[in-house]
């Protein structure tokens, strides 16, 4: 079965599972939708009545990892549909959600085992209507965020090894992030806007950029149909990120993050007594004059650095820290307005 056949088969399976017993259940969303832009073709996105998932295949491997990303999304939709059925009898807890996600990632890895090395990040969110709790599971640097009244009130933690080096689900056992994922929880309210997106969004857009997309879509949709408001939010966010590829004159969040890692690298080099003194001094002077360090706009920067892995050289980091043009990448956004 090739990737296209697999995805079609899984979509049919997920539809059947979702329809069983769900016809009278309104779900947690008053509006839900998604939008994408394909550059490498390695992202995948999906959603059901009370859950959303985004996976971002790593394009730096020998093979395109979009296959694994699509498998992860398909298996997650199936697993969370089953969790939703069970939750009608007993409200789920973080551990229940975590086990469902572990089962989904394990199944996807098994399906991808004979396809060579494939890597992907993933983030999924599940909403429980009874407790009003949302559960977030993340491996890598996809993000789950919540806006309330135009303000950012929740941001999930990225799991990373180094600058622009996320932890991944991998078909290669040595690469796969095997540490137990800590599920994050948040109590949501009616009218909250939840967005799930790949790093093609937060590498290029600041918090106020996305807040603007959310706000303008709400105003626009109020004059038309509120049922399409979430999809409009997703579409506007994708377009705003795409616009940075060609018409951006300010430093992007990717540059701001790189500047921060430059300062970390400076501290590490200072502690390393084997570094040439003249080279260190040159790097120190360059770090002191990085203009993106002066950017005050809020970025989506919450992360857990779970391993010290110096992947990029100091010169690479300096180059990234001066980046103004958008970082071209796949862009995937799933948005929901909570009921």
Locations of regions flagged by a protein language model:
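PP2C/PPM-type serine/threonine phosphatase catalytic domain
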Residues: 1-339
């Amino acid at each position: 079965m090739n990737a296209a056949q697999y995805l079609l088969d899984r979509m049919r399976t997920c539809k059947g599972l979702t329809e069983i017993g769900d016809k009278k259940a309104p779900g947690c969303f008053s509006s839900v939708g998604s939008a994408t832009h394909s550059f490498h073709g390695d992202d995948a996105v999906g959603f059901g009545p009370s859950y959303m998932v985004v996976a971002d295949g790593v394009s730096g491997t020998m093979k395109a990892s979009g296959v694994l990303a699509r498998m992860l999304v398909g298996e997650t939709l199936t697993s969370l549909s089953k969790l939703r059925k069970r939750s009608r009898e007993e409200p789920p807890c973080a551990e229940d959600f975590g086990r469902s996600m572990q089962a989904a990632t394990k199944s996807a890895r098994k399906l991808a085992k004979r396809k060579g090395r494939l890597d992907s990040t993933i983030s999924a969110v599940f909403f429980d209507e009874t407790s009003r709790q949302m559960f977030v599971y993340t491996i890598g640097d996809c993000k789950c965020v919540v806006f309330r009244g135009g303000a950012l009130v929740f941001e999930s933690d990225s799991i990373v090894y180094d600058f622009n080096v996320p932890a991944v689900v991998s078909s290669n056992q040595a690469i796969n992030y095997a540490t137990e994922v800590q599920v994050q929880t948040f109590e949501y309210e009616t009218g909250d806007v939840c967005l799930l997106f790949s790093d093609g969004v937060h590498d290029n857009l600041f918090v106020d950029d996305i807040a603007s997309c959310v706000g303008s879509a709400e105003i626009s949709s109020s004059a038309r149909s509120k049922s399409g408001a979430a999809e409009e939010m997703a579409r506007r966010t994708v377009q705003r990120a795409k616009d940075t590829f060609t018409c951006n004159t300010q430093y992007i969040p990717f540059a701001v993050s790189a500047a921060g890692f430059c300062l970390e690298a400076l501290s590490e080099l200072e502690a390393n007594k084997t570094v040439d003194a003249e080279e260190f001094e040159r790097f120190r002077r360059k770090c002191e004059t990085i203009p993106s360090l002066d950017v005050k706009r809020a970025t989506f920067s919450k992360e857990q650095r779970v391993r010290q892995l110096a992947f990029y050289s100091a010169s690479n980091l300096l180059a990234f820290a001066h980046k103004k043009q958008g970082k071209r990448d796949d862009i995937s956004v799933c948005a929901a307005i909570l009921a």
